[in-house]
Amino acid sequence: GNPPGDRYQSGPLHYFAMLPFGMIWYNGAPAELRDIPLGTHIHGYFLLPPEGEEKTIPAIPNMETYHVKYNHAVSLEDDFSFYQKRGQNWKVVSVDEIKGKINLTPEGKSAKDGINKPYTFDIDQVSKIWKSRKLVDLKEISPGTIVNFNLGWAQGWRDNEYSVSELWLDEESRAFATELQRKKHVRYQKQRWLPAWIDHVENFDYGGGVVTLTLFGGMDKSLYDELKATQEKGFGVGASDKTLRTWFHRADKKIGQVLDWKETGNPPLGSSGIQVRLKFTELLDGYRPGRIVRVKCHDWIFVTMPPEERFKSLEELKRSAIMGLP
């Protein structure tokens, strides 16, 4: 109900929560929120808060008019990932170093919800221009070159103007950026384990039980493959929460024997489509339907996480459920 200019000048920041099963992509590979540099333009798909969590992100007093109800992110992507995934590239039409402008026209498929028409962007000596595996000068940009980019803020942001923060000139540079991010993501998940949602718990009469869980989607395929290939050795399962933090997970976990591994095609957004049933001789308190856990492959090396990534008390766990606005 507010003109864009009014919202831009007077509205508050768009506070949002990342859903635990939300998926993040950067440079064409799975990522964590920490991987995306501040100031990066991103494409997001947002949902209404889950039932019972409507107050997680409350409206700021006296600014209710600007409150965005769709404030739980299920998907975040930088421009590189967004356009690449949808089959849209860009062709250089012209570059004006003096005026700091680059004209691009879309190539390939037309990306829905993105820029899909010829466009002029800001570009300057601070923009990172990648060719092969190194940075080059603006003069290396030639008309007719097929490129990918990431965008950032520009002075005319309110009027949909953007600056090019990074530009990839060839396939080698793009593949290198993607593989580097993929390796970073794989290392991160192996250290912290794959997140999953508990679907069902069958409690035994004298301790232990069977836990059925579904692994979240958006992870590199190699991680799921390693779990599947070593399932006969059992999985470590540590209790987590919606922030995906754990306790001292290398110790506060139980090993479950895999009874069943089931995969379904075309899973809903946020799901891997992989459901696993595990038998435990003991169950942790966090093994409850609807709760979140993190799952470790037997062959992954134990790594102790820094204290700021761990829960240390039940009070801290409780506080993490509420987003505190500055």
Question: Positions of the model-derived regions?
Answer:
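Short, flexible, surface-exposed loop segments at domain boundaries
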Residues: 1-326
